Amino acid sequence: MTVTSPIVDRYAVFGHPIGHSKSPFIHGQFAALTQESLTYEAILAPIDGFEASLKSFFSSGGKGANVTVPFKEQAFALCDSLSAEAALAGAVNTLSLLADGSIRGDNTDGLGLVADLISHLGSLQHKRVLLVGAGGAARGCILPLLNAGVGQLVITNRTQTKAKDLVDIFSQLEEGIYKDKLQALSMSELTGEFELVINSTSASLAGELPPLPQSIIGSTTVCYDMMYGAMPTAFNQWALQQGAAKVIDGLGMLVGQAAKSFALWRTVEPDTAVVLKLLREKLQLDI
């Protein structure tokens, strides 16, 4: 009698570089927590060979994939269908191979951000929010923030025209229902304190800071940096020096977006708290 092994679904994350990725660890933990049978690997795709690598993965049994820099826009172009978040972001971080062989693209970055913010703050309803940066990371978070009920979303960027372009795009959605909540300002035009300041730029990775005025930070301001590390980021250190009430890094967003991807593939959303704690401990050990 021949015993056949059950087929285990394959998932992966594609990037270049990819060795630093925490995704295999995160999804491995999610699989264990939910008792889902799957494998998840990191794949280093050649800069000029992402499409071929992805097609090879899917043709050899891959069911879904995450995509990180620099391939999110290329992945977007390969999709047969898109979620609303992905369509507006112009980039995808999650690919699903559907039963008919087509590829669906999602962008779970903003959903992961909002989930992490709510876990810390309880609600985003009516908050005055400043979003620093107007690149892909910012663009993927605007709709989830608006859907979470923020009262005002001001977008600021070194190049103000990019911030204005984003405001113009999102102001036209749903017959203009978000128009009164959105505003683009240069960094020198920012006035008054914000309840929440989100840094979507990668400046902290180089130990740099966007040229923001100190006046945006008040004694109740919460600051969030999408970057993360074993030590507080440069942006969060600056925020604390200005008197911010609380600072949060992007590790929870990383785990949160992964949980949303996992749920799209497996129809079960894992608990993020346990995995976030493990990942935080792992970061400390790697110092």
Swiss-Prot record:
One of its GO terms (biological process) is amino acid biosynthetic process. NADP(+) binds at residues 133-137, 157-162, 226, 250. InterPro entries: Aminoacid_DH-like_N_sf, NAD(P)-bd_dom_sf, SDH_C, Shikimate_DH, Shikimate_DH-bd_N, Shikimate_DH_fam, Shikm_DH/Glu-tRNA_Rdtase. Keywords: Amino-acid biosynthesis, Aromatic amino acid biosynthesis, NADP, Oxidoreductase. Homodimer. Belongs to the shikimate dehydrogenase family. The keyword NADP applies. The active site is at 72 (proton acceptor). It comes from the Bacteria. Its EC number is 1.1.1.25. Shikimate binds at residues 21-23, 68, 93, 109, 228. CDD domains: NAD_bind_Shikimate_DH. The keyword Amino-acid biosynthesis applies. NCBIfam families: aroE (TIGR00507), PRK00258.1-2 (NF001310). Pathway: Metabolic intermediate biosynthesis; chorismate biosynthesis; chorismate from D-erythrose 4-phosphate and phosphoenolpyruvate: step 4/7. It holds the Pfam family SDH_C. Involved in the biosynthesis of the chorismate, which leads to the biosynthesis of aromatic amino acids. Catalyzes the reversible NADPH linked reduction of 3-dehydroshikimate (DHSA) to yield shikimate (SA). This is Shikimate dehydrogenase (NADP(+)). GO terms for molecular function: NADP binding; shikimate 3-dehydrogenase (NADP+) activity. It catalyses: shikimate + NADP(+) = 3-dehydroshikimate + NADPH + H(+). GO terms for cellular component: cytosol. The lineage of its organism: Bacteria, Pseudomonadati, Pseudomonadota, Gammaproteobacteria, Alteromonadales.
